[in-house]
Amino acid sequence: HAPVLVFDDCDLERTLDMVVPQKFRNAGQVCVSPTRFYVQESIYQRFVDGFAARTHGVTTGHGLDAESKMGPLANLRRPAAIEALVEDAAAKGARVMAGGKRGNAGYFFQPTLLADVPDSAEIMNNEPFGPVAVAAPFSTLEDAVAKANRLPYGLAAFAFTEGLRTANLL
């Protein structure tokens, strides 16, 4: 359930260009897939808007179709499981910025971005293993580290900053 820390001194466009394709690679079914995006408050809305715009551009379909950027989920249970996580987050106040629905055939689920996701949402506590990115703001480096480390497990973590001091403190 890899956290991603996005600091306000990062190159935001470059960061978005890197993280969106990585999130939706193999429909988010990668153990080190970036999932929990913690973004510094001063750039939070710009990040969410940019992520949503790029997410709308992720086309789903057959893996051999050159136009497809994302394929299906692994099995029949996954779309229902992802749908339940999205519905739970929305019921707890998250905003659905992109996607949020099952695809129209097979095991597809739309590439999805949820913003303002509270810690109480199930998706903030359990790996979705699917094409859902969740975002929440943070104020300080200490706040970001606490949010990233609040779960007892994780195989990867990512940070985006142009500041050497911030990088060294992490």
Protein language model annotation of sequence segments:
Residues S68-K69, G106-Q110, N126-V132, L151-L155:
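Conserved glycine-rich beta-strand-loop-beta hairpin in the small C-terminal domain of fold type I
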Residues S120-N125:
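Cytochrome P450 core scaffold surrounding the K-helix E-X-X-R motif
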Residues H1-D119, L141-D143, K147:
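ALDH superfamily catalytic-core signature
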Residues A159:
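Conserved SAM-binding loop
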Residues A135-S139:
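Short acidic-hydrophobic, aromatic-tinged amphipathic segments that line or gate anion-handling sites
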Residues A94, V132-A133:
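Short, conserved active-site loop motifs that form the nucleotide-linked donor/cofactor pocket
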